[in-house]
Amino acid sequence: MYILPEELRAELKRPLGELHRSFSDVDVGNSFLITVGDVTTRNALEHGLKPDVSIIDNRIQRRDSDHEFRDTATILRSRNPPGTVTESLWKSIEEAIEGATERGERFMIVVDGEEDLAVLPSILLAPPDTVILYGQPDEGVVLVRASETSSKAEELMKKFEEA
């Protein structure tokens, strides 16, 4: 398990990619698509996007979410306490990406705990042409290109404490 050190919290509150104020401004083209977060995943689906992998925790800004996802993606379940990246989450992301790239299946990972930090392993495990979308609370949606951000994600993960 990787534990987020206190000194990284402020850095991770800044967007890792392009911040878009409106979801309508987001253009993912034909890229492999990963969405992280309930609101981001819901917005993607409402805008006609079909994420190859989506990661949710049924919570929005630390409160239980009451919306249902009407999606045909295969469901995977993972445990991941707040402020961590667990082996369970890492393996679920790996399994989902593998299934999506090799078999063309779509996956939704439902996290028991918190999915906020799933962006980092998603960047590191994703194929180079991947776009990752995640929410920036009260600001918009962040578009991250895995190929442009993988070295930054690796640098950040190296600063996590291993437990």
Curated annotation (Swiss-Prot):
MF GO annotations: GTP binding; kinase activity
Enzyme nomenclature, EC number: 2.7.1.237
Superkingdom of origin organism: Archaea
Class of this enzyme: transferase
Pathway: Cofactor biosynthesis; coenzyme A biosynthesis
Pfam families associated with the record: DUF359
Binding site for GTP: D38, V39, D57, E115, D138
Keywords, in A-Z order: Coenzyme A biosynthesis, GTP-binding, Kinase, Nucleotide-binding, Transferase
InterPro entries: GTP-dep_dephospho-CoA_kin (IPR007164)
GO biological process: coenzyme A biosynthetic process
Catalytic activity as recorded in UniProt: 3'-dephospho-CoA + GTP = GDP + CoA + H(+)
Family the UniProt entry places it in: Belongs to the GTP-dependent DPCK family.
Function summary: Catalyzes the GTP-dependent phosphorylation of the 3'-hydroxyl group of dephosphocoenzyme A to form coenzyme A (CoA).
Protein's name according to its UniProt entry: GTP-dependent dephospho-CoA kinase
Species whose genome carries this gene: Methanothermobacter thermautotrophicus (strain ATCC 29096 / DSM 1053 / JCM 10044 / NBRC 100330 / Delta H) (Methanobacterium thermoautotrophicum)
